[in-house]
Design a protein with these regions (language model features):
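Conserved alpha-helical scaffold segments that buttress catalytic/binding sites
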Residues: 2-306
Length: 306
């Protein structure tokens, strides 16, 4: 008889590929949830943000669960697939309650809920899902999103609407605000409300990821839960053609992805969203693959919590 136990042959690399898409499933005990929010109506720049959740899902099949840079392996991380909220045909006002309720269902039972928009109007109901009295909000965005609401809700006024709803300005931090992309009026509103403002110049001086880390710590000092809005128009337009509002001189995509991992790792971050990805404007799948990588980075950050 042989004196040793023979090892089972390793699975061929041709059959061993496991994608991030394969992490999505029906495990009700999963600590992370994924919810698609295909809201596209009332976008200031018309487009097809409603296509983004499905495009992101498809692109996840091209993301491996293994990060060779850090040795992180997501193979054992289950993500509950909460499907999509049926809001593609609705206005932001009509979609508010369905999005809030669907997000709340997940945030009440999960450590982290990932919302895939959709335009930036998804952020208001997402924050409401956590509760205005206990939530802090970080927006990674080229714009204040403080347009007046007298003409109705759109993707240019979710922060204004939240302030009117009762969210304290001191609980809001906005990082990545771009020059010549905002108004004096909006800047004044932010100052009067007590919002913490970090421009692109501040990001260049202090470091985008460093500012995200510092604002997470600041808000965690007095907020029970933190919501992080990732508007992809904060990325430099040369690296993100699929964002209608992106401008030259924005954040490097590498820093955007690093911030996703930082947010995913913070224990008080209970909900994140990805907004303003428009597949109809994508070039060479740059936006789709960036969105998928963002999702993987959020999960990698979350894995570090455990």
């Amino acid at each position: 008889m042989p004196s040793h136990v023979e090892k089972a042959p390793e699975m061929s690399e041709n059959n061993a590929w496991r994608s991030v898409h394969g992490l999505l499933g029906a495990d009700t005990a999963a600590r992370v949830a994924f919810l698609g929010v295909p809201l596209g109506r009332e976008s200031i720049t018309r487009g097809r943000c409603d296509l983004a959740p499905a495009t992101l899902r498809a692109a996840l099949k091209r993301m491996s669960v293994y990060d060779l840079e850090t040795g992180t392996d997501l193979s054992n991380l289950a993500v509950f697939d909460a499907g999509e909220v049926g809001v593609a045909a609705l206005t932001p006002a009509e979609a508010f309650a369905p999005i809030r309720d669907a997000a709340r269902t997940q945030t009440q039972t999960r450590a982290l809920t990932i919302l895939a928009g959709g335009n930036n109007a998804i952020t208001r109901p997402g924050v409401h899902a956590l509760g205005l009295r206990k939530a802090g909000l970080i927006t990674l965005d080229a714009h204040f999103d403080l347009r007046d609401t007298d003409g109705g809700l759109n993707n240019g006024n979710p922060i204004q609407a939240l302030l009117e709803d009762g969210l304290e300005g001191a609980a809001v931090s906005q990082i990545g605000l771009a020059p010549f992309a905002n108004t004096r009026k909006a800047h004044g509103k932010a100052r009067r409300a007590g919002i913490t403002v970090h421009t692109l110049a501040d990001c260049a001086t202090n470091g985008f990821v460093v500012l995200v880390e510092s604002e997470l710590e600041r808000l965690s000092g007095f907020c029970e839960a933190i919501y992080v809005d990732f508007d992809i128009d904060v990325i430099d337009r040369a690296q993100m053609p699929a964002a209608p509002g992106a401008r030259p001189g924005g954040i490097a995509v590498r820093d955007f992805l690093a911030a996703a991992r930082v947010a995913g790792a913070h224990p008080k971050v209970k909900c994140v969203d990805l907004a303003e990805f428009d597949p109809g404007r994508d070039v060479g799948e740059i936006g789709a693959l960036t969105a998928a990588r963002w999702f993987a980075e959020v999960l990698a950050g979350f894995a570090a919590r455990q």
